[in-house]
Curated annotation (Swiss-Prot):
It comes from Carica papaya (Papaya). The chain crosses the membrane at residues 38-58, 95-115, 134-154, 199-219, 220-240. It is found in: Plastid, Chloroplast thylakoid membrane. Gene3D superfamilies: ATP synthase, F0 complex, subunit A. The keyword Transport applies. This is ATP synthase subunit a, chloroplastic. Belongs to the ATPase A chain family. Keywords: ATP synthesis, CF(0), Chloroplast, Hydrogen ion transport, Ion transport, Membrane, Plastid, Thylakoid, Transmembrane, Transmembrane helix, Transport. One of its GO terms (cellular component) is plasma membrane. The keyword Transport applies. Its main location: plastid. Signal peptide: none annotated. NCBIfam families: ATP_synt_6_or_A. Pfam families: ATP-synt_A.
């Protein structure tokens, strides 16, 4: 009985530890689900910015493009180039996916530096860039995983899984492990960089006058854009790899 009681207490302790969270969070109860309100709010703001900007810029296309139309055409051309370089000639259907990933991450990253999230008071926790939350980056990475599995299966059918035993069946465990590490590396790279950037700026602002952290903030904007490009480029590369069947 003592052994059973000890085991029960140990399991209860592990369960309690698993419920520990970092920081405070605001949750909404929707049906039987508990959703992370902070991430939803900031994500909706980012989506609204993207949709609003696109609608305003291209609602009345001109033969001689306006500044807004010209900007979005340049962004589209840039995303097409990235997709074509990484995926190949069959890049066309994947441009919307790669573009959505790039623009959402780019605007999310910049919103952490440019939008005054902190002045909005919540009952629990505080608002921050969507990509400052591990839930967002993991979701984006899992979407990428689903996309490259779908691309491979659509192109090759069940023959897609033969890649796991190439060039030799001995590499089967390593090839399987690789598919698990891809979303992990994508999500933690993005989350870590954005979180570290925001923490550095917050610490500098609290320690020194406002003028001093400005160069660091500009550097943060640059690295935030680079992180969006890296994520989109790797997503396109994984999709291209799954369609070609080589590593």
């Amino acid at each position: 009985m003592d052994v059973i009681s000890c085991s029960s207490n140990t399991l209860k302790g592990l369960y309690d530890i698993s419920g520990v969270e970092v920081g405070q969070h605001l949750y909404w109860q929707i049906g039987g689900l508990q959703v992370h309100a902070q991430v939803l709010i900031t994500s909706w703001v980012v989506i609204a910015i993207l949709l609003g900007s696109a609608i305003i810029a291209v609602r009345n296309p001109q033969t001689i493009p306006t500044a807004g139309q010209n900007f979005f055409e340049y962004v589209l051309e840039f995303i097409r180039d990235v997709s074509k370089t990484q995926i190949g000639e069959e890049y066309g259907p994947w441009v919307p996916f790669i573009g959505t990933m790039f623009l959402f991450i780019f605007v999310s990253n910049w919103s952490g530096a440019l939008l005054p999230w902190k002045i909005i008071q919540l009952p629990h926790g505080e608002l921050a860039a969507p990509t400052n939350d591990i839930n967002t980056t993991v979701a984006l990475a899992l979407l990428t995983s689903v996309a490259y599995f779908y691309a491979g299966l659509t192109k090759k059918g069940l023959g897609y899984f033969s890649k796991y035993i190439q060039p030799t069946p001995i590499l089967l465990p390593i090839n399987i492990l690789e598919d698990f590490t891809k979303p992990l590396s994508l999500s933690f790279r993005l989350f870590g960089n954005i979180l570290a950037d925001e923490l550095v700026v917050v610490v500098l602002v609290s320690l020194v006058p406002l003028v001093v952290p400005i160069p660091v903030m500009f550097l943060g904007l640059f690295t935030s854009g680079i992180q969006a490009l890296i994520f989109a480029t790797l997503a396109a590369a994984y999709i291209g790899e799954s369609m070609e069947g080589h590593h």
